Every structure is written in structure tokens, then in C-alpha cells.
């Protein structure tokens, strides 16, 4: 019998890898890097209203101190001025979020509807789609994100429950502008 790796104590430096490090997840996130035009429809339960708006989302990979973690910056801003943000001040018209992958989780410095940090658990449907599950304060968020047509398009649907009542449903059709 041949020992492939006879060393029992491998040294990975200061930042050892997580056993469940998923290169597919890192690869999927790298496919999302770039500037996206996001055409959105929001269905809001409270107001019983539907809104359509266009946003820009920029996703950037950041340098990381750990070779085992992938860090990202997400920035968003509207294509033009919308009454939506005046009528619904809980939504941020523009903003920035830093997050990093650790295993099958996305650790966020803040969320879209909150400045609280938290974790999104990630499930991989196939090589093109991920599901993100997040909980913070009284919110439970379920987001499906699918890459299409050689990563030139993304389709996202987001369901948001507050205190176990469905409050927001969002559909986002996104077109990659800059890779």
C-alpha cells in the first residue's frame, strides 16, 4: 500500500481551510462579479401595492487576508429617482454591503433592510442556482438566484416574512452590463 500523504500534521499557515470549503460556491460567486442592471418588481403586502423600478448592482471581489475565504462588496443605487423610496423608507435607495464566504454560509456585515450583521445559509440547486436563507430581527428571507445564458442574465426571486407573515415578494431580472 502506498501512502499518498504520509504527513499527519499538515500546516496550512494561520488560516486553515474549512473541511467543507466548497470551490463550486466560490466559482459561482465569481461568475456574479460585475455591474448589473436590475429590473425589479416589488409586491408589498402592507400597502397592497406593486412597484417597478430599475437599480444598478455592482459586485466586486475584495482581497482577503485568508486564502480560504472569499470577500465581496455589493453596492446598489437606483437608475433614476423613484417615489418608492419615499413611500417605503425601510428600503435603502443606495448602499453598500461587505460579505464573505465561509463554508456554505455568506457572512454579511449588514442586510438590505437592516444594519445588523448576520449569516445567510446557502444551498446549491445546481451549477447555476443558489438559495440563500437568512434570518435577522423578525425577518426570514428566502432568495433564489439563478444565472442564465452564459452568466449574462440573472433571475432572482425573494420572499420576505416578518413575524411569520409574508410581507414582500420581489422579482429581479438582471442584465450584466460590465464583466
Model-identified regions with their sequence ranges:
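Amphipathic/hydrophobic helical signal segments and adjacent flexible N-terminal regions
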Residues: 1-94, 168, 176-179
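Calycin-type beta-barrel ligand-binding domains and close structural analogs
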Residues: 2-17, 80-179
Amino acid at each position: 500500500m502506498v501512502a499518498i500523504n504520509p504527513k499527519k500534521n499538515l500546516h496550512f499557515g494561520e488560516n486553515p481551510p474549512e473541511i467543507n470549503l466548497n470551490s463550486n460556491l466560490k466559482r459561482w460567486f465569481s461568475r456574479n462579479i460585475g455591474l448589473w442592471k436590475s429590473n425589479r418588481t416589488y409586491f408589498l403586502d402592507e400597502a397592497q401595492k406593486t412597484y417597478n423600478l430599475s437599480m444598478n448592482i455592482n459586485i466586486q471581489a475584495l482581497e482577503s487576508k485568508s486564502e480560504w475565504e472569499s470577500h465581496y462588496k455589493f453596492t446598489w443605487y437606483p437608475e433614476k429617482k423613484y417615489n418608492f423610496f419615499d413611500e417605503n423608507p425601510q428600503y435603502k435607495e443606495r448602499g453598500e454591503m461587505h460579505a464573505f464566504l465561509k463554508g456554505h454560509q455568506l457572512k454579511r456585515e449588514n442586510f438590505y433592510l437592516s444594519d445588523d450583521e448576520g449569516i445567510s445559509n446557502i444551498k446549491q440547486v445546481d451549477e447555476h442556482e443558489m438559495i440563500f436563507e437568512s434570518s435577522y430581527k423578525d425577518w426570514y428571507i428566502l432568495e433564489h438566484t439563478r444565472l442564465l445564458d452564459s452568466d449574462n442574465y440573472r433571475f432572482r426571486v425573494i420572499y420576505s416574512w416578518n413575524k411569520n407573515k409574508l410581507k414582500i415578494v420581489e422579482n429581479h431580472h438582471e442584465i450584466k452590463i460590465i464583466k
